[in-house]
Amino acid sequence: MFSKSLEALHHAKRYRKRELFDPLLKDYASNDYLGLSVKKDLLQNAFNKLQSFVSHSPKASMLVNGYHPLHAELEERLANLLGFESALLVGSGFLGNLALIDTLLVKNALLFMDAHYHASGIFSTKIKPNQVIFFSHNDIKDLKQKLFNAPKNKIKFIAIEGVYSMDASVAPYDFYAIIQEIPNAFLIVDEAHSFGTIGENLLGFLEYYRIKEKDKIIKLSTFSKALASYGACILAPLQTIEFLTNRAKSVIYTTALSLLDTALTLAHLEYFIVQKQELKNELSKHQQIIFETLGIRTLAGFFTLEFESNPALLNAHHFLKEKGFLVGAIRPPTVSKPLLRVSLSLKNSLEDTKELANTLLNYSKIQSSFKSG
């Protein structure tokens, strides 16, 4: 039934498959930026949190009887840590974007979304396409023009990522400034790749720009990157959270977040709060190695290298695997051009990162097929 489509994917070098990689490979492919996924003492802490409760399963939707004390504790701790009035757990970042876009786009609202916003957000806009306007990536001038052309009486949501997942760029401060100029404008910030990687205390985009006033901000923070767990949380003013709780289909009609993931997120969050400065210093050392060796400066927990073609990308990916390094090989249509995505996970040593950087440098001397992203 799908043979021709699969053949076309093979021919274009776009075919994907699930693969069990050699655990001895150095992991520079995952989003485990702070290296928490290998800390077994934190896993034991998570189990200990669960042991004190009769049930270890969420059982139902949060609006039936699936809401658990661990859920409430995580919401409260995140709201306090990140300086928001209220918080709402969701099953994943994908479900979080679906909840925000499907629910907040009421009849008199428009959404202005960065063209490079995460695929889950772009997918969610298809529900209400007539209420969505895309602007050029990180282009404040293009956004201002589109806002100027929009009806003045509409509620306006502007959706950006703190750190963009496929180019490591940090969204400009101007996106926050513009919502202060427009009375009925609000900012949605997907902090999936910025929490745990930027900011004085690694708290993300809002801390990076020292933004204190959050009454016009809605933050989506995921647990599957720096916090090495699963799930996500929407943080916003209380009224917004109450509205989402009552209207968001991906909150109402889905089982509450796994209690094991919730406990694991709490355990990892507690460790992060205590160790954040040490983690920041360690991440900075990895970033400095990449800059000194390859001349690539990244503010985030990863960097990218752009390739001319899928075969060239896959050749580099294979070469690095042979040298003991696993990196991400990201191909169209996920990105416009093939990218090698290199994550600076702290579970790797500084010596590992030096070796990887030198391996990439040596590869670049014999190949002219990539440039820094």
From Swiss-Prot:
Protein source organism = Helicobacter pylori (strain ATCC 700392 / 26695) (Campylobacter pylori)
Name the keywords, alphabetized. Acyltransferase, Biotin biosynthesis, Pyridoxal phosphate, Transferase
Q: Which Pfam families match?
A: Aminotran_1_2
Reading the lineage from the top rank, the first entry is: Bacteria
Q: Where does pyridoxal 5'-phosphate bind?
A: G93, F94, S165, D190, E191, A192, H193, T222, F223, S224, K225
Which residues span the membrane? none
The name under which this protein is listed is 8-amino-7-oxononanoate synthase
Which pathway is this protein assigned to?
Cofactor biosynthesis; biotin biosynthesis
What is a single molecular function from GO for this protein? pyridoxal phosphate binding
